[in-house]
Amino acid sequence: MTNGSPGWVELSSTKFYPKTSKILQKIKVISARGLCEKKYPGDIRQWKNMAFKSALDSIHDINRNIPTNIICFGDSIIEMEASYNLKEYFSNAYLKTIKFKESPTHTELEKELKIISTQLDSIMANSDKNLSIKVTRKKNE
């Protein structure tokens, strides 16, 4: 889910991260801007909220009464807020948010992804708990 224009994620990954681009071909990338910009011009928060809700609605066989983990990775508080708003659609939801640095360099993004990828098992091991992780810059960076 991106607030970028349709195709932006695919184009950027092809240019900067060709190996990642191949993986992304197997994942549905949704442009919140593409879905919602006409209805909510300039309201990027609403784009993300409505796109998250639309993605949830597209899962027809989901049981909203069983314990559910909502996991959000993003570099903006907007994703964190939109994922929090999804909790209201479940009777028993646990939210796990991983907020990356805003506007990271390529090197910083690679470090963030490597760190989180090594911790995914422990993040998911706490399936019955909420969790919030915020990646920040060191003071001297």
Region annotations inferred by a language model:
Residues G7-E141:
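C-terminal cap/substrate-recognition subdomain and adjoining C-terminal extension
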